[in-house]
């Protein structure tokens, strides 16, 4: 069999180089320097070492005194101030304001807001009765337990009850 014959006879796909029938030489020149040396030369080193405005604003040390101090800034600073809350050690990170101070269930009153008085506890709204069983039940007793749709009647595990949840009587 001649080496030029294709035994599968599938059409060959054309691309930019072989569409006209002749192969073009590659216009891309090989790099002169390796990558680690080229990164130390211009313009790559200048572009890499000069921060953009966006990347400067993302920096933890960035502070702009011209930012207006409006209501939104006040609310954001009340939740988290990244100028004072960064670069803390592990023991300071684990401390939380809610756990170190008695601020549980307190709400910050912003300018122009009026806080509503807290609602009284449920015990004042309803007469709650507490009952204690005089006879201690056994923890192994199934009387009064929560009914399950499965039963432990089989040896290898649990199976479904006959009527899907309760035994028929």
UniProtKB/Swiss-Prot annotation:
Coiled coil: none annotated. Residues 36-45 have a biased composition (Polar residues). One of its GO terms (biological process) is flagellated sperm motility. Residues 26-45, 150-169 are annotated as: Disordered. Signal peptide: none annotated. InterPro entries: CFAP276. Residues 160-169 have a biased composition (Basic and acidic residues). Expressed in cerebrum, cerebellum, gastrocnemius muscle, spinal cord and lung tissues. Its main location: cytoplasm. Disulfide bonds: none annotated. GO terms for cellular component: axonemal B tubule inner sheath; axonemal microtubule; cytoplasm; cytoskeleton; sperm flagellum. Changing residue 28 to I: Found in patients with an intermediate form of Charcot-Marie-Tooth disease; does not affect subcellular location; reduced protein expression; increased intracellular Ca(2+). The keyword Signal does not apply. Keywords: Cell projection, Charcot-Marie-Tooth disease, Cilium, Cytoplasm, Cytoskeleton, Disease variant, Flagellum, Neurodegeneration, Neuropathy. It is found in: Cytoplasm; Cytoplasm, Cytoskeleton, Flagellum axoneme; Cytoplasm, Cytoskeleton; Cytoplasm, Cytoskeleton, Cilium axoneme. Microtubule inner protein component of sperm flagellar doublet microtubules. Microtubule inner protein (MIP) part of the dynein-decorated doublet microtubules (DMTs) in cilia axoneme, which is required for motile cilia beating. May play an important role for the maintenance of myelin-axon integrity. May affect intracellular Ca(2+) homeostasis. It is linked to CFAP276 mutations may be the cause of Charcot-Marie-Tooth disease, a disorder of the peripheral nervous system, characterized by progressive weakness and atrophy, initially of the peroneal muscles and later of the distal muscles of the arms. Charcot-Marie-Tooth disease is classified in two main groups on the basis of electrophysiologic properties and histopathology: primary peripheral demyelinating neuropathies (designated CMT1 when they are dominantly inherited) and primary peripheral axonal neuropathies (CMT2). This is Cilia- and flagella-associated protein 276. It comes from Homo sapiens.
């Amino acid at each position: 069999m001649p080496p030029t014959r294709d035994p599968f006879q599938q059409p060959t796909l054309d691309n930019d180089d072989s569409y006209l029938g002749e192969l073009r030489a590659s216009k891309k020149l090989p790099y002169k320097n390796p990558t680690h040396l080229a990164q130390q030369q211009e313009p790559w080193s200048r572009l890499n070492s000069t921060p953009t405005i966006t990347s400067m604003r993302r920096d933890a040390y960035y502070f702009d005194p011209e930012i207006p101090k409006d209501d939104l800034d006040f609310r954001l600073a009340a939740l988290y101030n990244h100028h004072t809350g960064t670069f803390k050690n592990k023991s300071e990170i684990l401390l939380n304001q809610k756990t170190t101070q008695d601020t549980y269930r307190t709400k910050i009153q912003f300018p122009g807001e009026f806080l509503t008085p807290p609602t009284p506890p449920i015990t004042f709204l309803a007469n709650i009765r507490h009952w204690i069983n005089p006879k201690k039940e056994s923890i192994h007793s199934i009387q009064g337990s929560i009914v399950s749709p499965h039963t432990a009647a089989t040896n290898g595990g649990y199976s479904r009850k006959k009527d899907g949840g309760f035994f028929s009587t």
